[in-house]
């Protein structure tokens, strides 16, 4: 091979390497650009865009919002803030006395109509769903909030999970949510169709998701799976109902002070129900921390930033995140078992 041929061959190799470097550079620029755009969208959604106007969902026009799990925590706060926006309410929960007290509070303060239904969804009886159907039959419903949910009493290995607890979680989080939506969503479609000719009213279905569904959660395996299921179901429903002018959103939350989380004091990362619901209702239709997900929102700012960081670094399905999650819930389990042992000794 002559010297000139060697130079030509080296030039060809250099062009290949140079081309490869340009491809890598281009991919890097694309990644940085999309990351920057998602971060800007996060900031706009959380802090800069104005609050959503619920007039488009029929606020102050006699329309109804149905809420499950409405007697405590997040559900109770949804009822208060939707009543404040001028919606009549259908409140579905387990405890009659709590529902009656909330009914009186909201009717006195906001002068709205509040209908209540006390049923135990964990029983999964056909009569429960018939009662819901009868109550909602003649009501112009435009909003449904699927809030009812159940978790484990304490973190527990899947192989040690009691069958009753497992069945309750699936029944409440999945079966009941789907069946209630099948009952109420047609009413929303009907109401929106009638109103669209006059005012362009839209419908809205909100379903409570969880970080437990976003990130696989060892020691809460059944709960984690049930919430992950809701992600796929809610996104699919959003695609089906978009043609009917109904917005369907999954709401992702980290910890919130409530009886289910067993956390009493709020903090930077853990809002109270009032703070969480306020951030949710002001951001309906915006992704906030769920920039990579369709028809999904993580509305509370600290939760949103936390999700953004995990998603853009390790990834929600990575081994390291799974391991950290396992260690976190293992420590909670150990503390809970020690507390239970101390209580037994006192007795």
From Swiss-Prot:
It holds the Pfam family adh_short. HAMAP family: 3_ketoreductase. It is found in: Endoplasmic reticulum membrane. Present with 41900 molecules/cell in log phase SD medium. NADP(+) binds at residues 120, 147, 223, 227, 256, 258. Its main location: endoplasmic reticulum. The keyword Oxidoreductase applies. Its EC number is 1.1.1.330. Belongs to the short-chain dehydrogenases/reductases (SDR) family. One of its GO terms (molecular function) is very-long-chain 3-oxoacyl-CoA reductase activity. It is a single-pass membrane protein. This is Very-long-chain 3-oxoacyl-CoA reductase. PANTHER family: HYDROXYSTEROID DEHYDROGENASE-LIKE PROTEIN 1, VERY-LONG-CHAIN 3-OXOOACYL-COA REDUCTASE. Keywords: Endoplasmic reticulum, Fatty acid biosynthesis, Fatty acid metabolism, Lipid biosynthesis, Lipid metabolism, Membrane, NADP, Oxidoreductase, Transmembrane, Transmembrane helix. Component of the microsomal membrane bound fatty acid elongation system, which produces the 26-carbon very long-chain fatty acids (VLCFA) from palmitate. Catalyzes the reduction of the 3-ketoacyl-CoA intermediate that is formed in each cycle of fatty acid elongation. VLCFAs serve as precursors for ceramide and sphingolipids. It comes from the Eukaryota. Interacts with the fatty acid elongation system components ELO3 and TSC13. The keyword Heme does not apply. It catalyses: a very-long-chain (3R)-3-hydroxyacyl-CoA + NADP(+) = a very-long-chain 3-oxoacyl-CoA + NADPH + H(+); 3-oxooctadecanoyl-CoA + NADPH + H(+) = (3R)-hydroxyoctadecanoyl-CoA + NADP(+); 3-oxoeicosanoyl-CoA + NADPH + H(+) = (3R)-hydroxyeicosanoyl-CoA + NADP(+); 3-oxodocosanoyl-CoA + NADPH + H(+) = (3R)-hydroxydocosanoyl-CoA + NADP(+).
């Amino acid at each position: 091979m002559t010297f000139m041929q060697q130079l030509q061959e080296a030039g060809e190799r250099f062009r290949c390497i140079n081309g490869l470097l340009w491809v890598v550079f281009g991919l890097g620029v694309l990644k940085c650009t999309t990351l920057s755009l998602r971060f800007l969208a996060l900031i706009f959604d959380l802090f800069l865009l104005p609050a959503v106007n619920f007039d488009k969902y029929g606020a102050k026009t006699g329309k109804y919002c149905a809420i499950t799990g409405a007697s405590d925590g997040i559900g109770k706060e949804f009822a208060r803030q939707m009543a404040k926006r001028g919606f009549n309410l259908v409140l579905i929960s387990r405890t009659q006395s709590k529902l009656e007290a909330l009914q009186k509070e909201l009717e006195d303060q906001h002068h709205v109509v509040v209908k209540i239904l006390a049923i135990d969804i964990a029983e999964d009886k056909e009569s429960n769903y018939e009662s819901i159907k009868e109550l909602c039959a003649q009501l112009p419903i435009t909003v449904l909030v699927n809030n009812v949910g159940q978790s484990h009493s304490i973190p527990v290995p899947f192989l040690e999970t009691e069958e009753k607890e497992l069945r309750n979680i699936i029944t409440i989080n999945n079966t009941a949510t789907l069946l209630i939506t099948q009952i109420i969503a047609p009413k929303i479609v009907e109401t929106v169709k009638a109103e669209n000719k006059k005012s362009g009213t839209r419908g809205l279905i909100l379903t409570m998701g969880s970080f437990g569904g976003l990130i696989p959660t060892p020691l809460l395996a059944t709960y984690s799976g049930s919430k992950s299921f809701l992600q796929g179901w809610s996104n699919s429903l959003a695609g089906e109902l978009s043609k009917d002018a109904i917005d369907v959103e999954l709401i992702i939350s980290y910890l919130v002070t409530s009886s289910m989380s067993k956390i009493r004091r709020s903090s930077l990362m853990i809002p109270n129900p009032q703070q969480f619901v306020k951030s949710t209702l002001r951001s309906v239709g915006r992704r906030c921390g769920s920039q990579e997900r369709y028809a999904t929102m993580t509305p509370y700012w600290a939760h949103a930033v936390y999700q953004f960081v995990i998603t853009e670094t390790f990834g929600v399905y990575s081994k390291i995140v799974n391991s950290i999650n396992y260690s976190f819930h293992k420590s909670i389990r150990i503390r809970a078992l020690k507390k239970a042992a101390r209580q037994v000794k006192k007795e």
